[in-house]
């Protein structure tokens, strides 16, 4: 069982090009949060700061009360799934998941049981020996999620992980992640260009604009007619295309 972990960004500042970003927010352990906002608003940077791929110029990032601001990514209790390039093409499904337990693919019996269990939980029984090229886009992302499970980290970051999937398959993947979150207690943060995903998950919605948190709250409230004007304007612009 994965323990829950609060995530705290305290007065975190970071500059990217001409964009000065400032984040001050707490995500409660076990919660699922959707990060939305215009292109260039800082969504991926927000996740990269938590994962350790970027280092803030000031402020503190803590996970479960531990300051991780200057820890390298490998030492943080975080797993991350991207839209592409999550798998090694020359390895089988099983071997790609094995990497979550052992970088040199040397697994003991307990590890192998964990891998088999993870593959079963994401619906990939019988496909262990296939290579990624033989899988659909949704199946490849299921492999990535299985690897997250065997790593047993309390925080999962999804950077537009399901953006290339059609609506029905994307909802299947979101439902899978939400089911696993409830089972394990992990904290999930996901970047999405589809605010309706937050409604589908009944998630906390964090709206970024120009490198700052412009608004946050339950998706059902934020996406209602009474929601923040900046968010309603953003959604209106999206639907005009």
UniProtKB/Swiss-Prot annotation:
GO molecular function, one term: ABC-type thiamine transporter activity
Lineage top rank: taxon: Bacteria
UniProt KW Nucleotide-binding keyword: yes
PROSITE patterns tied to this protein: ABC_TRANSPORTER_1, ABC_TRANSPORTER_2, THIQ
Gene Ontology cellular component terms for the protein in this record: plasma membrane
The reaction(s) this protein catalyses: thiamine(out) + ATP + H2O = thiamine(in) + ADP + phosphate + H(+)
Presence of keyword S-adenosyl-L-methionine: no
NCBIfam families xref list: thiQ
Annotated function: Part of the ABC transporter complex ThiBPQ involved in thiamine import. Responsible for energy coupling to the transport system.
Similarity-based family: Belongs to the ABC transporter superfamily. Thiamine importer (TC 3.A.1.19.1) family.
Assembly notes: The complex is composed of two ATP-binding proteins (ThiQ), two transmembrane proteins (ThiP) and a solute-binding protein (ThiB).
UniProt name for this protein: Thiamine import ATP-binding protein ThiQ
Source species taxonomy: Bacteria, Pseudomonadati, Pseudomonadota, Alphaproteobacteria, Hyphomicrobiales
